[in-house]
Amino acid sequence: MSKKRSVAKENSSDDTDTIISPANDTAENGAAMSIAIVGMGCRYPGQADSADSFWQILTDGVDATSPIPADRWNNDRLSSPDPANEPGSLRAERMGMVHDIADFDAGFFGISPREAAVMDPQQRIILETAYDALENAGQTLETWGGQDVGVFVGAASTDYMSAQLIYRDGINGYTNSGSALSIIANRISYQFDFKGPSLVVDTACSSSLTALDLACRSVSSGDCQMALVGGAVSYTHLTLPTNREV
């Protein structure tokens, strides 16, 4: 990852991200502007780290779930056939797991190890997939840095923030920004020097679709020249799943 990104940055100068841009100018008769999807990046269970590998999983009918590893939680202690009547337990033997969720090339993005340590995985992964989407689109930060590029992200999970409050040893001056949902989008805009609208929207399961709708409206209205649209959700801790069949 580091080598690939370093080469891309040198030669040309992130969870799912999609880049959309106007396919043509608004017609003189007032017809709606066409919108084109020009690049994509993603991270999904089953080690799908690109649109091509994700599509391969779908076409091959691959089961992308896997047994719950011990480094996530002790499932033998927490598992129950009747979680509704056993507080603090859950029924789950397998999970859709994004591998290497703790890995992050902080130095590539100019982020200090101290700050990276308290960044929500949603922030880290979507920053990487945003960069991947730009590469996939054949776009460079030299071209779009400082331009009116919008960033619209759908996100709703705050379990990493909850974990920070429970396990307080790692809290530092970056914890607030590192766990805030709004920063998922704002960090991309800051790191890439994008000057367009930058926001996170939470409409539960429709968050990403709502973000896409807002991005299309923003591009069509001229609020931004191009938009990066994404969605992020990760559950790193058991506050939400416990007492539920998952």
What are the residue ranges of the model-derived segments?
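Cys-dependent condensing catalytic cores that perform Claisen condensation/acyl-transfer
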Residues: 2-5, 20-238, 244
